[in-house]
Each structure stands twice: as structure tokens, then as C-alpha cells.
């Protein structure tokens, strides 16, 4: 049995190709340094800032909750360290999904380079959207958002968060920050980088805005709603790559996308335009995290409306492009002539008829004239 040669040589250490091929292992080593730091008293004080959530407050038990105290959290500058650590975790999870799930499917399906990159993108995002949607829904149910929608604006500012709420926002920020180095690790094309930067920037802008302005209740509801619609799109695209005749998922996504934009505007106007506008405390106070002033409310609504308009504009262009491609694909099939059978009778029909009708010249052929004369 012949010895199989290696497909590629090992690149030099710390070279460009070495970092791309082994970035998950390198990041894992960096993350392990923070975890090992927890084992020693000297470094534990620094490592704990990166690994665990900071700024916790213990509220004493009340008469309604006489059994246990409540542990709540607020945000601060140390959250950047926590976001950095979980950004490393997101890079590791991204590499695991890519290597053990998506790459195996790609080898079986034999996609082209264009489909390969789009399949990887949809595979990663569909996993993230599904996980975030389930996690966010669990928080909504556990904190009674569904049974009492007024919690979106009641008792603002919402500067104190539960562990699940704060960890959710930290994870969201970490994931979208990890998308920046992934542009380098995944060898994203130069023409696709501007689109990706706008895409990532919009997520970070709105998630960080909801987190810093203490609009975490509204932000959570809108994220779950948006993630569900986006999950449906990317899972439909995955099915489309396996079977190009599959279109049902896109049709359902198109309807839910429009409804999602409408619900986003309704909830935003209801919360910011009516709920917070009628609140008694409308003074800017950084110490308590109260940003319920007219200028901030207008800025929040304007940013949401502009983003929704931008998404609808992209959606309309996407649908028009799909319709043009679909009509262009069907046009040759409509114009295509039926196959002509070879034979003497078919040639006579072609020569003597137009659109299936016999002409006068055909009826008065030389043979017919000979029969008449006889």
C-alpha cells in the first residue's frame, strides 16, 4: 500500500496561513490562560473580571419573596473585559461548528465556492439565531414579559438586571464583536467586507444602545422577534442549497419579515413614544441611569425607524431581484418551440402550412393539378 502524501505543507509558525489554519487553537490557549488564572490567588482578582459577570447587587428578601434574596446586576466599564473573554469563546464555538458540522456537509454536497461561503454563513447564523431565540424566549417567560407587556416601560430606568438578562446581553455583544476577526479568519472577499461591516455595525449599535440606555426589556423583545425571522431565512437558504426547487420557506419568511418590521415599529412607538413619554420622572440622571428625556426618545425612535426603513429597502430589492431571475429563467421555456419530428409528412406540413393551416398553394400542388387534368 503506497504512502499517502500530505495535501499541503505545514506553513511556518506565526505566518499568515499558520494563523488562519490554527486560529481556534491559538484562541483556546488565550482563553485557557484566563481560566488558569482563577486557580491562583495572585491572578484570580484579574481573571475573575474576564470570566464572571461584574457589578452585582444583593437585594434583601421582601414579604413577597421571603425565602431568598435577589441578586441583580448593573453595567459598568469592567463589562468590556467580560465581553472580550466571551468573544474568545464565540470564536472557539464558531470553529467547532465549522469543522465538525458545516465542513462535513460541504464535502458531501460538493458546493461551488460561492455556495460554499453562503452555506457557511447561513449555517453559523442559523445556529446562533436559534440558540439566542430560545434563550431570549426563556427569559421573556420567566420574567413575565408575555403576561404583562407594560413591563417594557414600567418602573424605568431598568438599571438592574437579572443574571440571565445581563449574561444574554454580554453574549450578544461578544458574538457580534467576534464577527470582526472572523472576516479575517474566513478569508472574506474584499467586495463582501463593506456589506458585512454594515451588518455587524447595526447589530452592535442597537444592542449596545439598548444595554447602555437601560432599555434592555424592549431590546430583548425586539431581538427575539428579529432573530426568529432571520433564523427562518437562513434555515430556508440551507434547504435551498440542498434542493433549489425549495421555495416555501422563502415565501413564509417574506410574510413574517414584513410583519416583523411592523411589530418592531409598533412596540417601539408604544414603549418609547407613549409609555416613557407619560412617565413622571423625565430628567436626565447618569447616576441612576435615567435617560428618559425628549431628545433621547426622539433619537431612539429615529434610529429604529431608519433601520427598519433600510431593511425594508434591502428586502424589496432582494425580492425584485428574485422575481427578475425567476422570470428570466421561465422566459426561455415559454419561447421554446416544440420538437419537430423527422419524416416526410412533417416536412410537407412545414412547407405547405403556416401555424397548422394549409395554404392555397399547398392545396393546388402539381400532383393535384395532374389528377384534375386526368
Curated annotation (Swiss-Prot):
<comment type="subunit">
    <text>Interacts with SEC61B. May interact with Derlin-1/DERL1.</text>
</comment>
<feature type="transmembrane region" description="Helical">
    <location>
        <begin position="215"/>
        <end position="235"/>
    </location>
</feature>
<feature type="topological domain" description="Cytoplasmic">
    <location>
        <begin position="103"/>
        <end position="121"/>
    </location>
</feature>
<dbReference type="GO" id="GO:0006616">
    <property type="term" value="P:SRP-dependent cotranslational protein targeting to membrane, translocation"/>
</dbReference>
<feature type="domain" description="TLC">
    <location>
        <begin position="117"/>
        <end position="326"/>
    </location>
</feature>
<feature type="region of interest" description="Disordered">
    <location>
        <begin position="331"/>
        <end position="374"/>
    </location>
</feature>
<keyword id="KW-0597">Phosphoprotein</keyword>
<comment type="similarity">
    <text>Belongs to the TRAM family.</text>
</comment>
<keyword id="KW-0325">Glycoprotein</keyword>
<keyword id="KW-0256">Endoplasmic reticulum</keyword>
<keyword id="KW-0653">Protein transport</keyword>
<dbReference type="GO" id="GO:0006986">
    <property type="term" value="P:response to unfolded protein"/>
</dbReference>
<dbReference type="GO" id="GO:0045048">
    <property type="term" value="P:protein insertion into ER membrane"/>
</dbReference>
<dbReference type="GO" id="GO:0006613">
    <property type="term" value="P:cotranslational protein targeting to membrane"/>
</dbReference>
<feature type="transmembrane region" description="Helical">
    <location>
        <begin position="298"/>
        <end position="318"/>
    </location>
</feature>
<feature type="transmembrane region" description="Helical">
    <location>
        <begin position="122"/>
        <end position="142"/>
    </location>
</feature>
<dbReference type="GO" id="GO:0005789">
    <property type="term" value="C:endoplasmic reticulum membrane"/>
</dbReference>
<feature type="compositionally biased region" description="Polar residues">
    <location>
        <begin position="352"/>
        <end position="363"/>
    </location>
</feature>
<dbReference type="InterPro" id="IPR006634">
    <property type="entry name" value="TLC-dom"/>
</dbReference>
<feature type="glycosylation site" description="N-linked (GlcNAc...) asparagine">
    <location>
        <position position="56"/>
    </location>
</feature>
<feature type="transmembrane region" description="Helical">
    <location>
        <begin position="193"/>
        <end position="213"/>
    </location>
</feature>
<feature type="transmembrane region" description="Helical">
    <location>
        <begin position="252"/>
        <end position="272"/>
    </location>
</feature>
<protein>
    <recommendedName>
        <fullName>Translocating chain-associated membrane protein 1</fullName>
    </recommendedName>
</protein>
<feature type="transmembrane region" description="Helical">
    <location>
        <begin position="30"/>
        <end position="50"/>
    </location>
</feature>
<feature type="transmembrane region" description="Helical">
    <location>
        <begin position="82"/>
        <end position="102"/>
    </location>
</feature>
<dbReference type="InterPro" id="IPR016447">
    <property type="entry name" value="Translocation_assoc_membrane"/>
</dbReference>
<feature type="topological domain" description="Cytoplasmic">
    <location>
        <begin position="236"/>
        <end position="251"/>
    </location>
</feature>
<keyword id="KW-0813">Transport</keyword>
<feature type="topological domain" description="Lumenal">
    <location>
        <position position="214"/>
    </location>
</feature>
<feature type="modified residue" description="Phosphoserine">
    <location>
        <position position="365"/>
    </location>
</feature>
<feature type="topological domain" description="Cytoplasmic">
    <location>
        <begin position="319"/>
        <end position="374"/>
    </location>
</feature>
<keyword id="KW-1133">Transmembrane helix</keyword>
<feature type="transmembrane region" description="Helical">
    <location>
        <begin position="160"/>
        <end position="180"/>
    </location>
</feature>
<feature type="topological domain" description="Cytoplasmic">
    <location>
        <begin position="1"/>
        <end position="29"/>
    </location>
</feature>
<dbReference type="Pfam" id="PF03798">
    <property type="entry name" value="TRAM_LAG1_CLN8"/>
</dbReference>
<feature type="topological domain" description="Lumenal">
    <location>
        <begin position="51"/>
        <end position="81"/>
    </location>
</feature>
<feature type="topological domain" description="Lumenal">
    <location>
        <begin position="143"/>
        <end position="159"/>
    </location>
</feature>
<feature type="compositionally biased region" description="Basic residues">
    <location>
        <begin position="334"/>
        <end position="347"/>
    </location>
</feature>
<feature type="topological domain" description="Cytoplasmic">
    <location>
        <begin position="181"/>
        <end position="192"/>
    </location>
</feature>
<comment type="function">
    <text>Involved in the translocation of nascent protein chains into or through the endoplasmic reticulum (ER) membrane by facilitating the proper chain positioning at the SEC61 channel. Regulates the exposure of nascent secretory protein chain to the cytosol during translocation into the ER. May affect the phospholipid bilayer in the vicinity of the lateral gate of the SEC61 channel, thereby facilitating ER protein transport. Intimately associates with transmembrane (TM) domain of nascent membrane proteins during the entire integration process into the ER membrane.</text>
</comment>
<keyword id="KW-0812">Transmembrane</keyword>
<feature type="topological domain" description="Lumenal">
    <location>
        <begin position="273"/>
        <end position="297"/>
    </location>
</feature>
Amino acid at each position: 500500500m503506497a504512502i499517502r502524501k500530505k495535501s499541503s505543507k505545514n506553513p511556518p509558525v506565526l505566518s499568515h496561513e499558520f494563523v488562519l489554519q490554527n486560529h481556534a487553537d491559538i484562541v483556546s490557549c488565550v482563553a485557557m490562560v484566563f481560566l488558569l488564572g482563577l486557580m491562583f490567588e495572585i491572578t484570580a482578582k484579574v481573571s475573575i473580571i474576564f470570566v464572571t459577570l461584574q457589578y452585582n447587587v444583593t437585594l434583601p428578601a421582601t414579604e413577597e419573596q421571603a425565602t431568598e434574596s435577589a441578586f441583580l446586576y448593573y453595567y459598568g466599564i469592567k463589562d468590556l473585559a467580560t465581553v472580550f473573554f466571551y468573544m474568545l469563546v464565540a470564536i472557539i464555538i464558531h470553529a467547532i461548528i465549522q469543522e465538525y458540522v458545516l465542513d462535513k456537509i460541504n464535502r458531501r454536497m460538493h458546493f461551488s465556492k460561492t455556495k460554499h461561503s453562503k452555506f457557511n454563513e447561513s449555517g453559523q447564523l442559523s445556529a446562533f439565531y436559534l440558540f439566542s431565540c430560545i434563550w431570549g424566549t426563556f427569559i421573556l417567560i420567566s420574567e413575565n414579559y408575555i403576561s404583562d407587556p407594560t413591563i417594557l416601560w414600567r418602573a424605568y430606568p431598568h438599571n438592574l438586571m437579572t443574571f440571565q438578562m445581563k449574561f444574554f446581553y454580554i453574549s450578544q455583544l461578544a458574538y457580534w464583536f467576534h464577527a470582526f476577526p472572523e472576516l479575517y479568519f474566513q478569508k472574506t472577499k474584499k467586495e463582501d467586507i463593506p456589506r458585512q461591516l454594515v451588518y455587524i455595525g447595526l447589530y452592535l449599535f442597537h444592542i449596545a444602545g439598548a444595554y447602555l440606555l437601560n432599555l434592555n426589556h424592549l431590546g430583548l423583545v425586539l431581538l427575539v422577534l428579529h432573530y426568529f425571522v432571520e433564523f427562518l431565512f437562513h434555515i430556508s437558504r440551507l434547504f435551498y442549497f440542498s434542493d433549489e426547487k425549495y421555495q416555501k420557506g422563502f415565501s413564509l419568511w417574506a410574510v413574517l419579515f414584513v410583519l416583523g418590521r411592523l411589530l418592531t415599529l409598533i412596540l417601539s412607538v408604544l414603549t418609547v413614544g407613549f409609555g416613557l413619554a407619560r412617565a413622571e420622572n423625565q430628567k436626565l440622571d447618569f447616576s441612576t441611569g435615567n435617560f428618559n428625556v425628549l431628545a433621547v426618545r426622539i433619537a431612539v425612535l429615529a434610529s429604529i425607524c431608519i433601520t427598519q426603513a433600510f431593511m425594508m429597502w434591502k428586502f424589496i430589492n432582494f425580492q425584485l431581484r428574485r422575481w427578475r431571475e425567476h422570470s428570466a429563467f421561465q422566459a426561455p421555456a415559454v419561447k421554446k418551440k416544440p420538437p419537430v419530428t423527422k419524416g416526410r409528412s412533417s416536412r410537407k406540413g412545414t412547407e405547405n402550412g403556416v401555424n397548422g393551416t394549409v395554404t392555397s398553394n399547398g392545396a393546388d400542388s402539381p400532383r393535384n393539378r395532374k389528377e384534375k387534368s386526368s
